[in-house]
């Protein structure tokens, strides 16, 4: 990595090659790793300027922190409802969810979170990608009507489910299945939403719950978020099945201005 002063340093790129958005020659914003930590590099990549110049919050931990900040400020109330408390990594039965929210009446909302960094492209367009990453093209017409959509997940089909089905993220498929099971067992007693992990104390819970998923679209150039069969067939099967069973899917967009993140509203989802 060539720094602004011309020197060269090693930087860690976490999260499965940052979703394929970090390519040779890309501009990045770095954070300095703490001395004496477990990482072997002095820096970690936090933001990447994707093709077109849009800053992407590609580091996985950014999504968690942004979701926590949005919840603390009440910015997700339109999707998740108002709440008076938020507990992170709460255990519900055999599943540990990212958030457990509670409203003034004691009704709970269970929340799981997914960070979204990749987008689709107009058909016929080209952009560099690391080996093994393919562009996901829009299913809609090109031209002035094209509106970029965020896509989750994007990556190599290098993981497998228990039945041997290949997928991009076994963890994501597992979470959607678990949320669907919660929704099936809920009986409408408790709301459950999936948004993104943040820090905080864990708490064991046992009540039944419904379920939902909220994607954090960590780039400001997308107008919706989609689970595409062309990027991960396994999740493209499980997500609509979960939605039909009562799992709600929500999304919000983050727009970056340098190192500052701005909440940029809720987005429609397509599962």
Please give the residue ranges for each predicted region:
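Beta-strand/loop nucleic-acid-binding surfaces
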Residues: 6-22
